[in-house]
């Protein structure tokens, strides 16, 4: 939210450049991103063996989707006028952000969050490169089960995948329809 807010609040060549920089992971395959992370942080054994390492990879991979989702909602409203109105009533910058920006950006936050979670659950290449034997995510466990011909375990992984993804996709559709109704 802060990145999208900053980009929406201060348009110009610098914000366009920052937006392109934030969108860079869209042009880089997950495998290349994982290799870069391994090159940078692979020697840090404590960090490399923790779940935070995979989390950093997923945040970098999905950040553009979240920022663009929120930015689209913020760009559709007259943010400057809303903030000036709140400031004229004595609201501090923090109050304006909390009480004006966040509620108005909520459809974008919700749509972005659902998109990010759905992408993150299904991302295999990045996670496969970053995981350790003690840290397996759902896609890696599913692939390992099929590779070792443990079809009963693979079936259980598939069922868990299905139970997680279908409600998320339904929530994304609902959030998208709700956001369209709100903006019209």
Positions of PLM-derived features:
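Hydrophobic residues within alpha-helical transmembrane segments
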Residues: 21-25, 56, 102, 110, ...
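Loop-to-helix entry region at the N-terminal start of transmembrane alpha-helices
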Residues: 42-65, 108, 113
């Amino acid at each position: 939210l802060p990145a999208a807010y900053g980009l929406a609040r201060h348009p110009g060549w610098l914000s366009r450049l920052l937006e392109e920089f934030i969108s860079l992971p869209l042009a880089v395959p997950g495998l290349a991103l994982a290799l870069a992370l391994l090159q940078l942080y692979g020697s840090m054994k404590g960090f490399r063996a923790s779940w935070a390492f995979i989390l950093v990879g997923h945040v970098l991979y999905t950040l553009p989707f979240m920022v663009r989702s929120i930015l689209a909602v913020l760009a559709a409203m007259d943010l400057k006028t809303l903030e000036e109105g709140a400031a004229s009533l004595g609201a501090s910058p923090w109050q304006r952000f909390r009480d004006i920006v966040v509620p108005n950006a909520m459809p974008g936050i919700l749509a972005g969050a659902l998109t990010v979670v759905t992408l993150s659950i299904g991302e295999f290449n990045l996670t496969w490169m970053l995981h350790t034997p003690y840290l397996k995510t759902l896609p890696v466990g599913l692939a390992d089960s099929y590779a070792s011909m443990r079809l009963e375990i693979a079936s259980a992984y598939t069922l868990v995948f299905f139970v997680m993804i279908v409600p998320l996709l339904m929530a994304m559709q609902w959030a998208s329809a709700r956001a369209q109704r709100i903006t019209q």
